[in-house]
């Protein structure tokens, strides 16, 4: 840790020492001293405004009010679109939000009492999944072969070296 901070401090010192050489004592061009005008001013202000405020609901609302004041005339109150009351009870949801896959699979989500449990994957589907979950090693290949061809394991394997994983 100490070596890294010394390295960072040395690098900063080197940059500060070489900075006057890079500037070569020349003043900045006149274009940098003039403030931007017209459309460039508003574009520059928008870029700066995006970095000054944190991205929250309040900051987005304030930014929208500054950028589009014509939309706020006579609006007042809540500007959210009215929700269609007929769609309120449709679908499988919790308070208007979609149920995540974990909640729908485990039955722990809202409104899941009437649904049958999902079917378990078939053997070929399970094997396709198994290929992606396990590294390709001797043990995983042996396990996969036992799952694919259980009829070959009836005799015990012959060598006596088989073991249950």
From Swiss-Prot:
Coiled coil: none annotated. Expressed by the venom gland. Disulfide bonds join 94-110. Residues 56-68, 135-149 have a biased composition (Basic and acidic residues). Keywords: Disulfide bond, Hypotensive agent, Secreted, Signal, Toxin, Vasoactive, Vasodilator. PROSITE patterns: NATRIURETIC_PEPTIDE. GO terms for cellular component: extracellular region. Residues 26-83, 129-165 form a propeptide. It is found in: Secreted. Pfam families: ANP. The keyword NAD does not apply. Residues 154-165 have a biased composition (Gly residues). It comes from the Eukaryota. Residues 56-100, 135-165 are annotated as: Disordered. Residues 1-25 form the signal peptide. The keyword Transport does not apply. One of its GO terms (biological process) is receptor guanylyl cyclase signaling pathway. One of its GO terms (molecular function) is toxin activity. Natriuretic peptide that dose-dependently induces the rapid relaxation of rat aortic strips phenylephrine-precontracted. Acts by stimulating cGMP production in a dose-dependent manner (by probably activating NPR1 and/or NPR2). May also show potent hypotensive effects. Belongs to the natriuretic peptide family. Negative results: does not inhibit platelet aggregation. This is Natriuretic peptide Na-NP.
């Amino acid at each position: 840790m100490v070596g890294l901070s010394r390295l960072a401090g040395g690098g900063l010192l080197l940059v500060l020492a070489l900075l006057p050489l890079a500037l070569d004592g020349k003043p900045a061009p006149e274009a940098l001293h003039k403030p931007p005008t017209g459309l460039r001013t508003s574009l520059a202000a928008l870029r700066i405004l995006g970095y000054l405020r944190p991205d929250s609901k309040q900051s987005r609302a304030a930014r929208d009010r500054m950028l589009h004041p014509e939309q706020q005339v006579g609006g007042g109150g809540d500007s959210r679109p009215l929700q269609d009351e007929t769609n309120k009870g449709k679908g499988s949801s919790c308070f208007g939000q979609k149920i995540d896959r974990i909640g729908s699979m485990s039955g722990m989500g809202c409104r899941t009492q009437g649904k049958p449990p999902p079917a378990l994957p078939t053997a070929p589907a399970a094997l396709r999944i198994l290929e992606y979950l396990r590294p390709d090693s001797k043990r995983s290949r042996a396990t996969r072969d036992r799952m694919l061809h259980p009829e070959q394991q009836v005799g015990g394997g012959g060598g006596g070296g088989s073991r249950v994983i």
